[in-house]
Amino acid sequence: MTNIRKTHPLMKIVNNAFIDLPTPPNISSWWNFGSLLGICLILQILTGLFLAMHYTSDTTTAFSSVTHICRDVNYGWIIRYMHANGASMFFICLFMHVGRGLYYGSYTFLETWNIGVILLLTTMATAFMGYVLPWGQMSFWGATVITNLLSAIPYIGTNLVEWIWGGFSVDKATLTRFFAFHFILPFIIAALAMVHLLFLHETGSNNPTGIPSDTDKIPFHPYYTIKDILGIMLLILVLMLLVLFTPDLLGDPDNYIPANPLNTPPHIKPEWYFLFAYAILRSIPNKLGGVLALVLSILILVLVPFLHTSKQRSMMFRPISQCMFWILAADLLTLTWIGGQPVEHPYIIIGQLASIMYFLIILVMMPAASTIENNLLKW
């Protein structure tokens, strides 16, 4: 008799995705981040659900409802901080996951890669709207500044912004709709993640060498289930260290001041995971130019597969490309740092140089490095 997990219509899907999945034998810990993102998403949906039970999306009560969750709801404080810091862990895993894809040439799986880019954009939108919900100073002004960027779109810009706001400023209508979108988007992310996985399992996983491993596979369970469990335990350890010891480390103190449209905070800045894009936005003096650069800083990932000029897939055996990759990583850290600094000398020029470098590395230097390596292989 065949095992039920191989015949049952539902269990068969789970079996083919997580148990009997043929997996390359040499995938490293960089391949753990996919499962960690799944865990992060489940954690965010669960904590978010319990927060939504006590939260009110009204400008007069939103701030106090969050305070109520932390003070009066049983374990409300831990749920709130797990949700807030869970978002940070989510983005750490996302950046590592994308970085892995860039380094090992996983972007040659076009459908998987493009759905991944859509997932990244959707997650960024969700996180932005979630940051508005506590209705603190940084929530209000962050929402005002970022939604206002759409007014840079010629002709329809102003109408579009007012349509998103539901009025002539960020107000009750804006908060209510942001809560509605923030609630629904994680489920859309979950659906997209399933499609992401579906396309990945059409081709099978890449591996560090970038060489097809179809002749050499091992079952996902128990080898990678146990490896994933180790990753999950480490993720939860780091998250709980953050939550229990320094819950406000990654937050902004200004968000403990209730939203006040009449008082602008001295430095409006988003959460740390958006700072690199914010730095690129600020580095261009023109409004429309800044918005375009901001959008392109993420959408440039769609171009990466078409800029691949190397004869090899992975960067494992390409030292010049490796140098370019790590310069890009350092550049992104520089942009993240600049995004959190005030707009003054020398930060302005550093931000502008780092922004130019970002696009230059991806569009010019990486393809050039690959071409040089191709020619070196002929010697």
UniProtKB/Swiss-Prot annotation:
<feature type="transmembrane region" description="Helical">
    <location>
        <begin position="288"/>
        <end position="308"/>
    </location>
</feature>
<dbReference type="InterPro" id="IPR030689">
    <property type="entry name" value="Cytochrome_b"/>
</dbReference>
<keyword id="KW-0812">Transmembrane</keyword>
<dbReference type="Pfam" id="PF00033">
    <property type="entry name" value="Cytochrome_B"/>
</dbReference>
<feature type="transmembrane region" description="Helical">
    <location>
        <begin position="347"/>
        <end position="367"/>
    </location>
</feature>
<feature type="transmembrane region" description="Helical">
    <location>
        <begin position="178"/>
        <end position="198"/>
    </location>
</feature>
<dbReference type="InterPro" id="IPR048259">
    <property type="entry name" value="Cytochrome_b_N_euk/bac"/>
</dbReference>
<protein>
    <recommendedName>
        <fullName>Cytochrome b</fullName>
    </recommendedName>
</protein>
<dbReference type="GO" id="GO:0046872">
    <property type="term" value="F:metal ion binding"/>
</dbReference>
<keyword id="KW-0408">Iron</keyword>
<keyword id="KW-0349">Heme</keyword>
<dbReference type="GO" id="GO:0005743">
    <property type="term" value="C:mitochondrial inner membrane"/>
</dbReference>
<feature type="binding site" description="axial binding residue">
    <location>
        <position position="182"/>
    </location>
    <ligand>
        <name>heme b b562</name>
    </ligand>
</feature>
<keyword id="KW-0679">Respiratory chain</keyword>
<dbReference type="InterPro" id="IPR048260">
    <property type="entry name" value="Cytochrome_b_C_euk/bac"/>
</dbReference>
<keyword id="KW-0479">Metal-binding</keyword>
<keyword id="KW-0830">Ubiquinone</keyword>
<comment type="similarity">
    <text>Belongs to the cytochrome b family.</text>
</comment>
<feature type="transmembrane region" description="Helical">
    <location>
        <begin position="33"/>
        <end position="53"/>
    </location>
</feature>
<feature type="transmembrane region" description="Helical">
    <location>
        <begin position="226"/>
        <end position="246"/>
    </location>
</feature>
<feature type="binding site" description="axial binding residue">
    <location>
        <position position="97"/>
    </location>
    <ligand>
        <name>heme b b566</name>
    </ligand>
</feature>
<keyword id="KW-1133">Transmembrane helix</keyword>
<dbReference type="GO" id="GO:0045275">
    <property type="term" value="C:respiratory chain complex III"/>
</dbReference>
<comment type="subunit">
    <text>The cytochrome bc1 complex contains 11 subunits: 3 respiratory subunits (MT-CYB, CYC1 and UQCRFS1), 2 core proteins (UQCRC1 and UQCRC2) and 6 low-molecular weight proteins (UQCRH/QCR6, UQCRB/QCR7, UQCRQ/QCR8, UQCR10/QCR9, UQCR11/QCR10 and a cleavage product of UQCRFS1). This cytochrome bc1 complex then forms a dimer.</text>
</comment>
<dbReference type="InterPro" id="IPR016174">
    <property type="entry name" value="Di-haem_cyt_TM"/>
</dbReference>
<dbReference type="InterPro" id="IPR027387">
    <property type="entry name" value="Cytb/b6-like_sf"/>
</dbReference>
<keyword id="KW-0472">Membrane</keyword>
<keyword id="KW-0999">Mitochondrion inner membrane</keyword>
<dbReference type="Pfam" id="PF00032">
    <property type="entry name" value="Cytochrom_B_C"/>
</dbReference>
<feature type="transmembrane region" description="Helical">
    <location>
        <begin position="77"/>
        <end position="98"/>
    </location>
</feature>
<feature type="binding site" description="axial binding residue">
    <location>
        <position position="83"/>
    </location>
    <ligand>
        <name>heme b b562</name>
    </ligand>
</feature>
<dbReference type="InterPro" id="IPR005797">
    <property type="entry name" value="Cyt_b/b6_N"/>
</dbReference>
<keyword id="KW-0496">Mitochondrion</keyword>
<dbReference type="GO" id="GO:0006122">
    <property type="term" value="P:mitochondrial electron transport, ubiquinol to cytochrome c"/>
</dbReference>
<feature type="binding site" description="axial binding residue">
    <location>
        <position position="196"/>
    </location>
    <ligand>
        <name>heme b b566</name>
    </ligand>
</feature>
<dbReference type="GO" id="GO:0008121">
    <property type="term" value="F:ubiquinol-cytochrome-c reductase activity"/>
</dbReference>
<keyword id="KW-0813">Transport</keyword>
<feature type="binding site">
    <location>
        <position position="201"/>
    </location>
    <ligand>
        <name>a ubiquinone</name>
    </ligand>
</feature>
<comment type="function">
    <text>Component of the ubiquinol-cytochrome c reductase complex (complex III or cytochrome b-c1 complex) that is part of the mitochondrial respiratory chain. The b-c1 complex mediates electron transfer from ubiquinol to cytochrome c. Contributes to the generation of a proton gradient across the mitochondrial membrane that is then used for ATP synthesis.</text>
</comment>
<keyword id="KW-0249">Electron transport</keyword>
<feature type="transmembrane region" description="Helical">
    <location>
        <begin position="320"/>
        <end position="340"/>
    </location>
</feature>
<dbReference type="InterPro" id="IPR036150">
    <property type="entry name" value="Cyt_b/b6_C_sf"/>
</dbReference>
